[in-house]
Design a protein with these regions (language model features):
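Catalytic Walker B motif of ABC-type/P-loop ATPase nucleotide-binding domains
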Residues: 191-194
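Helical segment within the ABC ATPase nucleotide-binding domain
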Residues: 205-217
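ABC ATPase NBD Q-loop/coupling interface
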Residues: 83-104, 164
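Conserved ABC ATPase "signature" region
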Residues: 85-90, 94, 140-160, 213
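Conserved ABC ATPase signature
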Residues: 164-170, 174
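Conserved catalytic motifs of ABC-family nucleotide-binding domains
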Residues: 187
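The feature captures the beta-strand-to-loop junction immediately N-terminal to the Walker
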Residues: 54-56
Length: 251
């Protein structure tokens, strides 16, 4: 009697998980007065990843960020064509539709600038201010949110006994983390970062990079950077901009 048993080999299908698309642009063009700054930009940017945008000065990198939160609308002489859609609250939305006011969009799409820009008020009020603008009146909830957000950016232990001090008295790295906290306190789905470490020393820059990596769990990050080493370290996707045109880079 042959005791040999046949063993059937089961081949399991390979499942490739593609990140969901968070931001999509189609034929996007941007003009400042008579100059075209962005040219036919067609992108699909994934959710919960860091997308880095590099390129020479004046190529359109920072302008692209202002298109994503409509900040350019505050500047005279600008115009736009094409389409920008975002997945917000579980639905794809045209961010330039009349049904989505700019203030509502900016609560979902936060922004951190190149130079730290604390408001001329206390550390506590710097974080509480956006909540009050969003009509939050519960003082206890505001207090809890300020504390949890400062902890999120690893600043709480450094400032918990100084909350009444002017935020502008903090060091450069602390100020940038304060600005990150101010952007995060409204729980944005997308965070735009315009060279967030360019004015910081190497130690502070490293701290910000680690923080950005930790934020991928909760939001999508789009970062403009001049530093190739930095984008290689922390980005999932890279684009290089030249003369208003985007080109995908290998990471």
């Amino acid at each position: 009697m042959d005791s040999t048993k046949n063993h059937n080999t089961i081949t399991l299908p390979v499942i490739i998980v593609t990140p969901a698309i968070k931001i999509q642009t189609r034929s996007l063009c941007f003009y400042y007065r008579r100059q075209q700054v962005l040219r036919d930009v067609c992108l699909e940017l994934p959710a919960n990843q860091i997308t880095a945008i590099t390129g020479p000065s004046g190529s359109g990198k920072s302008t692209f960020l202002t298109v994503l939160n409509r900040l350019w609308e505050e500047v005279e002489g600008c115009s736009i064509s094409g389409k920008v859609t975002m997945e917000l609250g579980g639905q794809m939305k045209d961010i330039y539709s009349r049904g989505l006011p700019a203030p509502e969009l900016r609560r979902k799409v936060g922004m951190v600038f190149q130079q730290p820009n604390p408001l001329p008020m206390s550390i506590y009020k710097n974080i509480a201010f956006p909540l009050r603008l969003a009509h939050q009146k519960n003082k206890e909830l505001i207090r809890e949110k300020v504390e949890s957000t400062l902890k999120q950016v690893y600043l709480w232990d450094e400032v918990k006994d100084r909350l009444k001090e002017d935020g502008r008295l903090l060091s450069g790295g602390q100020q940038q983390r304060l600005c990150l906290a101010r952007a995060l306190v409204l729980d944005p789905e997308i965070l735009l970062l315009d060279e967030p470490t360019s004015s910081l020393d190497p130690e502070a820059s490293s701290g910000i990079e680690e923080l950005l990596l930790s934020l991928k769990k909760q939001c999508t990050l789009i970062m403009v950077s001049h530093y190739h080493d930095q984008t290689q370290r922390i980005s999932d996707l890279q684009f290089r901009v030249s003369n208003g045109r985007f080109r995908l880079q290998e990471t």
